[in-house]
Amino acid sequence: RNQFGDSVGIYHSKMTPSARYKAWKKFRSGELKVIIGTRSAVMMPAPKLGLIIVDEEHDASYKQQEGFKFSARDIAIKRAQIIKIPIILGSATPSLRTLKLVEEKKFQTVSLTKRVTQKSPPKFSILDINEVKLVSGLAPQAIEAISQTLTQKKQAMIFINRRGFAPQFICSYCDWKAMCNSCDSSLVFHHQAARLICHRCDSAFGVPTHCPSCSKAQLSFLGTGTEQLEETLKELFPKTAIHRMDRDSTTKAGSLETILSEINNSDTGILIGTQMLIKGHDFPNLELVVTVDVDQGITSLNSSAVEEMGQQLIQVAGRAGRSDGNATVLVQSRYVNDQNLLQLKSGNYLNFAKSLMEQRQATTQPP
């Protein structure tokens, strides 16, 4: 709006129906010249659409998984193709599908070869956590690195793409596991809400004291989420400001802006968060990043898991060292000799993507 004034509007699902309709109507009439929106905005009518920009085009959230399933990225490309207008796909970590289109000369590339701040990228260090006793998912070496960062009056970020307290709730006697009655997904324990919540359909259930299957009182939590990390780090660093940024901590209006303001107005502190943390935010004083659950990407059977792991690692690394170029990314893993992880250690995403493309071609996997 600083550039284009009142001709800029927004469109997303958190708006009231009346506000969404007003934005839709103004864009259709041409009163709004620029619309910034989420997935559904790609279908908004416009009298003279001249350009489509898909920011962070690699992001899996462009895919609508429930109800009417679609990819907003793919619809944007098709729409631009039909009405013969330019489309820009922006990303520091382009999807393999996009890189394949570039290889086939169907897309042109414009590369930014330097960071905006002209500072050196952070150094990657892979931390072997085999035979290491973890504290809420953190290795002692990672905790020590956080402590040193705080001593230097800098900020540390803990990246874990799991919200809630623990991703699994099980019975150690009969192996019962809490599952959603509606969609059969694993239920996640949320401590603050004192509920078992399905992250797929948002169904919520009470927390049983005895196993529904065998009636034994041998229920326990498995795994680590953002809530658990927050509680543990508050115990380890009681005098340090700790900020958690995930879907649960940013539901209230203005809460995200408040968290970001607190982070940017303090020299030191700890940031904990999910993928929400890595989407374009600028944290000038961030000097350390610790990734907790990178092994999910290595062991998952999902064909896109390794690609998404690489994208997340490079994106989260991009938040650090923007002011003095002296940052470190600590990658905790039990697979320290994994070739894809070692490829990412250089911090060069395109080399990683090229290697991954070659692996996929060798096994006849898309793209």
Indicate where each model-derived feature is located.
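Inter-lobe coupling/hinge segments of SF2-like helicase ATPases
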Residues: 1-367
